[in-house]
């Protein structure tokens, strides 16, 4: 809030899709100018949808068929819904999301799906390499570790979201500051000079950032903003 009072624009830049960001009460309580969602594929600024990119229909069946062929647990992520593969048992992570969002869940097999990206979990039978190859015409693979994978359309990333907004507001990248903590933040941490890693972030990212702040629970974001004189 102090950052915005001082005339700066504040955005959430998330891999999550729109509903999974704006329906989090703690995010709304803080207050942001906008949201870069779905790894750059959906950008909302003060209620205006500046960019909405969804997976082309010709890729829908290819993703679902490949997930079943190579035994990957699949979750399609859209601006309004999660799409669950109900043909296989759910692991704890998928079940938790299914239970948390009863008004935002659909079956992957319904027609006319609308999604921006997807994630997968490996199973004991998974052939991850073959799955990644099968969907590679459309998607970039981010290995999140622990058998969890994130797949974003080639033309979009957290970095492209930053560039879109910089162009929109006539800013240079030197005017942009980014704070991240995990591997799906790597594109934006590499893209912007003033890149900041949370103290509790993935250790391998330390070599990719300009500054490492304190842990999230030790006022890491506030301390980073103070370090760069963005707030007093």
Annotate each language-model stretch with its function.
Residues 7-11, 31-33, 116-118, 174-175, ...:
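Short active-site oxyanion
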Residues 28-31, 39, 134-138, 191-192, ...:
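Short, structured coil segments at secondary-structure junctions
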